[in-house]
Amino acid sequence: MATSSFNINELVASHGDKGLLATALVDKTAHEQLEEQLQHQRRGRKVYIRNVLGVKDSEVIRNRYGGKYDLHLTQQEFAPHGLAGALRLCETLDCLDSFPSSGLRQDLVLDFGGSWVTHYLRGHNVHCCSPCLGIRDKMRHAERLMNMRKIILNDPQQFDGRQPDFCTHPAAECDVQAHFAISIHGGYDMGFRGLCEAMNAHGTTILKGTMMFDGAMMFDDQGVIPELNCQWRKIRSAFSETEDVTPLSGKLNSTVFSRVRKFKTMVAFDFINESTMSYVHDWENIRSFLTDQTYSYRGMTYGIERCVIHAGIMTYKIIGVPGMCPPELIRHCIWFPSIKDYVGLKIPASQDLVEWKTVRYLTSTLRETEEIAMRCYNDKKAWMEQFKVILGVLSAKSSTIVINGMSMQSGERIDINDYHYIGLAILLHTKMKYEQLGKMYDMWNASSISKWFAALTRPLRVFFSSVVHALFPTLRPREEKEFLIKLSTFVTFNEECSFDGGEEWDVISSAAYVATQAVTDGKVLAAQKAEKLAEKLAQPVIEVSDRPEAPSPTPDDPADVCGKEQEVSELDSLSAQTRSPITRVAERATAMLEYAAYEKQLHDTTVSNLKRIWNMAGGDDKRNSLEGNLKFVFDTYFTVDPMVNIHFSTGKWMRPVPEGIVYSVGFNEHGLGPKSDGELYIVNSECVVCNNESLSNVTRSLQAPTGTISQVDGVAGCGKTTAIKSIFEPSTDMVVTANKKSAQDVRMALFKSSDSKEACTFVRTADSVLLNECPTVSRVLVDEVVLLHFGQLCAVMSKLKAVRAICFGDSEQIAFSSRDASFDMRFSKIIPDETSDADTTFRSPQDVVPLVRLMATKALPRGTHSKYTKWVSQSKVKRSVTSRAISSVTLVDLDSSRFYITMTQADKASLISRAKEMNLPKTFWNERIKTVHESQGISEDHVTLVRLKSTKCDLFKQFSYCLVALTRHKVTFRYEHCGILNGDLIAECIARA
């Protein structure tokens, strides 16, 4: 049997790609890769570009950011330089994405010169430094106020309680500290060194920014950035359009070797065919981003890296490092791709041929023109005839020609002012070349003198030639006049970086610290994400601690109490207590410090907001006067805070003060504090009760308590107030509530009076305990404890010197929430030592029980333990819940026997306005109309929940808010709503019941 052999590898290499299976496999792999790219793009952040963009502009922005963001080009409106504006938004998001987006305070990002309204509307964790350097900046602020008002009016619930975070100080003068910063086209006014100094002032280590970039700025006096349709030009000053005609050698010398110029050169950016605002910036600042490498300032060394240059926009980053920097050669290049096909041609700039200038000329055109000029050159012809030949070739190579009815551009059009001088320069160049070639030929065919000269040694020939040239300058050949100059396509910059910053930077320790901190923050964020996922529909349940229960000291054991007090007295401060080996002491001290910091930040935010309004209205830190469009400014802020107002020195207010409102403090040039009737000052809603700073100071002065915290976690209506009433002992106890309304209810239950001296002594709010003198007690009873910050509860125990706190509350109802979204809140939840449950309600009717069970099933994540899945009712009322649709607020049946609740302040305001129109008594709309949050802990016979809008409102999806709304009544509950709201948990459950 014959045998044969073959090489399988050769066969696969030569024929494998032709097989059907190979083609199918390639097609499948390509399809999978394309599908992955498409799915990744769809998962990216959605960015809506409203500006109308052409086909080329759309390609530019998609090529740059299409792979990172899910771009939606809606083509809604024409805007000045639309592509530049669209790119600016994407650049802002791109630079922000370089930094952690946790929302934690330690991940705050600064924006030097950015648009604060963009960050405000998107909820970014960003502080903007937006100084008013001129009329344009003030115009932008006014426009941003208008835009903010317009958007808030369309969706006020989304922005309820949110404040814009910005200042009007220059970047180097703002005192906000942050590790990260961005600068979107903000470096033009500061330069590289100015940005570094601003970073140093803010404690910033990494900055990422963008700016318009054209490498030809290092060579030319004017140019075009084609992708942006932008034309730039160097001018002598900001108020003169005189062209900068500094010779090339002078430009390179001043650029590379010297930073001193005889005049201030500006760069004007104009957008072609757009009669809109242009921009003028200092060339020194722009050039610094092209030439500078490093800068050492106050113990830090800052280095710039140019990351991406695309579509005329350069993205760069500046990183600051401490300590010593050993010598290192830093090198970078600037390329000029726009001149790689050109050659420099020197032409006369004046008729006396003294001044010459360099123009760029297309290499291909010059080569063909020079070729024809050399072939047609005749020394016997008049120079004019040869000049005409060259001009004819130039015209043919730079004109529009028509071939078969189609017009085509041959070469590149020449400036009409340079046309004749270019022809003359080529003529002189041709003549000089022929003369040089003639000399070479004559030297080859030399005479006896030439042979004698050639017989000399080289040193003698050089000496003799130099003597002849010095004695007879007219005999000197003209080859030193070079008409053609080879243009370099790049310029290099070499700089030696060396800085002695003192102590060496311990990178290893820094890495360990950052890793530890990141793990801690990551765990917190993971917990917060899980919590937010659950809170979309319900408030998560606080699980019982797994730690072993500590023995609870009682008033009957004085020795144990004294021991506890001695243990605390050995610790110097809350900061020291956070390191206590006793876990619960450390936890409580940490929570108290966080609560103090939170109240301090609320105070600082109030001052900052009022100062911003004061400055926007034309005020300053020296005069008691405002100069500006007060009505426009305050009308804009009024949409966010209806309590914003101005008190004039005449004693009058700009807007009527709401009835029953008394402002305790105001703000003017002297800051925030009590004001007199003869002063000009401004106020907002925080000026009615302004005790945040006092609460912070008091909390910091206390020490963490060591007593036992017991929590009774009961369902709504389980008799928490009744339990407080049954165990209350005036000799040893004090009742503390989270708010004034709860305090009044408990006072009525205990003392049948809400304002008697006895009632006000033994039943107080937590704020009242901390801010006023109060007797010490051994036990504190807390109502609605979930509305308190854990640190505030600990501060109350410490102030009262209580050894035991019995806390009543429902962990599944509305809990304490931060009023400052930028504050990094971690320790607000109550950590009890003992926990007990109560699952029987005496208030809620029978039909509410299955409704709440259904809500818990629909809203809470699967696997979540809730006491409402097994709660029972002892009420004798079997049916209480009804609902009806209404078309407007006028159809709401306002009855003094009913209690009205709303989810939003806007609906509450509408009901109050309707009550005033119906001339109902003040006590009705002051006491019988509340929000769900305000009504937590209230018990009424007849309750009506009102929803007047069908716009998106996440509160109707949250289990905690719906639970409070549905469990306030004893006899009847009516749900009156306008329209259909997607995700309305209460409406869906009532419909299914």
Curated annotation (Swiss-Prot):
GO molecular function: ATP binding; helicase activity; hydrolase activity, acting on acid anhydrides; mRNA methyltransferase activity; RNA binding
Subcellular location field: Host endoplasmic reticulum membrane
Topology within the bilayer: Peripheral membrane protein
Residue ranges of every copy of the (+)RNA virus helicase C-terminal domain listed in the record: 839-993
SUPFAM superfamilies: P-loop containing nucleoside triphosphate hydrolases
GO cellular component: host cell endoplasmic reticulum membrane; membrane
EC annotation from Swiss-Prot or TrEMBL: 3.6.4.-, 2.1.1.-
Keywords: ATP-binding, Helicase, Host endoplasmic reticulum, Host membrane, Hydrolase, Membrane, Methyltransferase, Nucleotide-binding, Transferase
Domain Alphavirus-like MT as annotated: residue spans: 72-290
Residues given in the record as ATP binding sites: G714, V715, A716, G717, C718, G719, K720, T721
Region of interest called Methyltransferase, as start-end residue ranges on this chain: 51-409
Domain (+)RNA virus helicase ATP-binding residue range list: 684-838
Disordered, as annotated region: 543-576
Presence of the UniProt keyword Repressor in the record: no
Region feature ATP-dependent helicase, mapped onto this chain: 712-975
GO BP annotation list: methylation; mRNA modification; RNA processing
Function, as annotated: Involved in the virus replication. Contains a helicase domain and a methyltransferase domain. The methyltransferase domain is probably involved in viral RNA capping. Involved in the formation of ER membrane spherular invaginations in which RNA replication complexes form.
Quaternary assembly: Interacts with RNA-directed RNA polymerase 2a.
Protein family membership: Belongs to the bromoviridae replication protein 1a family.
Protein name as catalogued: Replication protein 1a
Gene source species: Cucumber mosaic virus (strain Ixora) (CMV)
